[in-house]
Amino acid sequence: MAAMQAAIADAGISAADIDYINLHGTGTRDNDISEARAINTLFGRQRPLMSSVKGAFGHSLAAAGAMEAVVSAISISNSLVPANVGCRCPDPDLKLVPVMQPSQGPIETVLSNSFGFGGNNAAIVLGACGKPKPDRTPADTQPMAILGSACVTGTGRTGWTMRAVAKGEACAGLLDLQEISANLSAG
């Protein structure tokens, strides 16, 4: 939830200004529960339209965030919310209702979630060009801001990492721990 809150605050808007959430939505129990809890807490009963494109594309791992940001931008420019492909019956325990068929309508602001292994989570707010929110502006206007921190995980080489993960083995990085965690310091 912290990534979503930070993205919304950095955009100078409120949760009520979000028209569509591009869910991380992997269809895995733990991920979907975590994302649903965060959305339900942040948005309450005023949840915007939402869907995940992973049912259409699959999980593209490291490329997922970039692909979903592009889908979010296309949603804004085409005023279209993509369907949650492959979802036939949403889990009622999640208390979320994804868009089941493509939905046409005005979409000016999108929150796109990307959650990584080990809690490396990101969220980005994308808005329609030339449509600023008149009552709120970011305190520090920047073309882009990266909020939070992350660390390099795995071996640094996708093939090696995936083989180790498939075997249930630990992944040893190519960088030493001090170098990897340098950006995690509080100061």
Question: What are these regions, as identified by a protein language model?
Answer:
Residues M1-G187:
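Conserved "HGTGT" condensation-loop signature of ketosynthase/thiolase-family condensing enzymes
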